[in-house]
Amino acid sequence: MVNFTVDEIRGLMDKKRNIRNMSVIAHVDHGKSTLTDSLVSKAGIIAGAKAGETRFTDTRKDEQERCITIKSTAISMYFEVEEKDLVFITHPDQREKECKGFLINLIDSPGHVDFSSEVTAALRVTDGALVVVDCVSGVCVQTETVLRQAIAERIKPILFMNKMDRALLELQLDAEELYQTFQRIVENVNVIIATYNDDGGPMGEVRVDPSKGSVGFGSGLHGWAFTLKQFSEMYSEKFKIDVVKLMNRLWGENFFNAKTKKWQKQKEADNKRSFCMYILDPIYKVFDAIMNYKKEEIGTLLEKIGVTLKHEDKDKDGKALLKTVMRTWLPAGEALLQMIAIHLPSPVVAQKYRMEMLYEGPHDDEAAIAVKSCDPDGPLMMYISKMVPTSDKGRFYAFGRVFAGKVATGQKCRIMGPNYTPGKKEDLYEKAIQRTILMMGRYVEAIEDVPSGNICGLVGVDQFLVKTGTITTFKDAHNMKVMKFSVSPVVRVAVEPKNPADLPKLVEGLKRLAKSDPMVQCIIEESGEHIIAGAGELHLEICLKDLEEDHACIPLKKSDPVVSYRETVSEESDQMCLSKSPNKHNRLLMKALPMPDGLPEDIDNGDVSAKDEFKARARYLSEKYDYDVTEARKIWCFGPDGTGPNFILDCTKSVQYLNEIKDSVVAGFQWASKEGILADENLRGVRFNIYDVTLHADAIHRGGGQIIPTTRRCLYAAAITAKPRLMEPVYLCEIQCPEVAVGGIYGVLNRRRGHVFEENQVVGTPMFVVKAYLPVNESFGFTADLRSNTGGQAFPQCVFDHWQVLPGDPSEPSSKPYAIVQDTRKRKGLKEGLPDLSQYLDKL
């Protein structure tokens, strides 16, 4: 059944120029898993007839039931590429001489936006991405999100237009319309690529181009696909033209005039577009003959395209026959394989330009150089991007990629978590690796050792890492950079066991859940509640199901989903706030003000951060936000956690001993910005100015115990006097629906405080795309509500987009924010009612 053995794969692992690490990414339901099947069947892992229905990479039971991919799954496959195709691989680092075998490590990733953290984990360990787009619905919001992530990680995309069978059979598009649809999708994808890619960057040309062969067309369900290369090979003998020249002619504004036998650039009466005439017409003829049961035509057509049917296939007709014919004529596995081998980079090529994005340390130390040259004899550098649960309850494989060196069974190495800093001991373990394994979709195979440029799993590392980390043998190595997720966990649920005696099991289960999902957060509140935070309703539902059935194995009680809020201020403090230390010898004077719009987002994106050179940062702030340069240079720190979207500014004039209390003030600020004044939520977009400090001359009277609580009280007083407000998270919703259902969408959104900001028709189809902002708080049950109001015709996708201020004053008992604040305070076990200013403000 399988065309290769583990030994063959191990042999290929050393030929690093013939390795391709790639992931399949796309919008939800555009056919990633189905398409992956045709590659898997080409490798001989599943039977060809089953391809397109098996969805081999959907390994979990709930994935099969819901027909969605939830976890990304890896699989390694061995292929041989024919001599005539090897000619197209021109770069010397893209293939080994005298070797036809290619090793393709493929990761099938989920398309649903709630699981986009899985996509991030998959992208980190791969070098190329196959972007699948449904040619009927075009480029959607999730396509754009994952493509943007891929380009930020410096991953080279190739494009595949899926579901061509729908365009022909359901929509009945004619050839010219179909060409225009393709043309539009290619343009859209290239616009996204150009927006996020720096031109003249180290990756070279990343835009996709059908005439170069980096765009495929076909149908994953029916198992057929082609690139222009396949067709131009068929025609090159007939026309006696070079294959590459012909590929350029088969796309774009090229027309062939049958009467004069000449190529032309303009459309005239007698000529047809070459793509339609030479590629789409034969396909249309085959579809037409078979679907309309024209027996005589079928025979002559099959002879022309060179397809001979097997004996058992001769009795088929209709769709079954169509599938068989198209599959024999244009096998999908072959077309995809050629695209992957020719256009995606090998680890040798990719690590040259990805090293600086991946490695935190200096770019000239031993580890960095080994990663850059993908050197199997250098020190081991491996990044673990996620944990995969094993059949053995509670144990995990660590799944990741070897960037340099070799990882072997029984090898001793340093396991570094994300908080490790070189030279310190925290988050660092020195342990031996129990086993190295090869991931094969639903199965794993044991393997002795794995050299650089490959993807593998490790056994026995899971006790030392939570989710991600770096494994190395080089003692001065820095960490690989932490992954940036495009969504953030904003929806929370409190869980407790139905039987209180099961509490230890729940805690154990939460630990395992935190391991198995790259993004979920498990928090224990001060009131003793266990909170799970996820990206959205679906993500939480899957997490809770996993927790109940696999990780904790006990019945649970779940609260209703709750949304995380942020606190902010709406204007400058109306008075100077003074606080005295407990021993009355030190005084602080401060005010709070809101940041200008856009600055908190800049801090979140890392455009302004604590690591920046302070003069450059001050220049940026003064140019973009009109900050005073001298003040902007004196940002003491960001918070919460040293990176959050609030900061404290030193506006004092010549104060004695100021630097000695800086650490204490910063500590107080981190505390205050993590637990805001209204409901103990994080602060966002607040700038605190320190105006004056009076300190005791004796160092012993101005220690941390005096300054930290004083700072916190002063910050709270400043926040209360600056009109505090609540901020809520907002989803960007993209809804696809037919024209008749658009009215129903507006109704549902208006009831839920949402508003539509863009609506357009997908050209060439009756579908509309509506984009709207919807507060997360109102999004529970939104999908069900929407479907019942539109007769099940609308499909929403919600992505966390931004934070916005909740209208209303939290101090007025009749307002909505007041109710939310009281609910939150009650849930967290805080005193009812808002805190009084007099607790925090002191008199001179």
UniProtKB/Swiss-Prot annotation:
MF annotations from Gene Ontology: GTP binding; GTPase activity; ribosome binding; translation elongation factor activity
Modification sites for Phosphothreonine: 57, 59
One cellular component (GO) term of this entry: ribonucleoprotein complex
Keyword GTP-binding among UniProt keywords: yes
InterPro entries: EFG_II, EFG_III/V, EFG_V-like, EFTu-like_2, G_TR_CS, P-loop_NTPase, Ribosomal_Su5_D2-typ_SF, Ribsml_uS5_D2-typ_fold_subgr
E.C. number: 3.6.5.-
Compartments where found: Cytoplasm
Family: Belongs to the TRAFAC class translation factor GTPase superfamily. Classic translation factor GTPase family. EF-G/EF-2 subfamily.
Cited function: Catalyzes the GTP-dependent ribosomal translocation step during translation elongation. During this step, the ribosome changes from the pre-translocational (PRE) to the post-translocational (POST) state as the newly formed A-site-bound peptidyl-tRNA and P-site-bound deacylated tRNA move to the P and E sites, respectively. Catalyzes the coordinated movement of the two tRNA molecules, the mRNA and conformational changes in the ribosome.
Protein name, per record: Eukaryotic translation elongation factor 2
Organism: Drosophila melanogaster
Gene behind the chain: eEF2
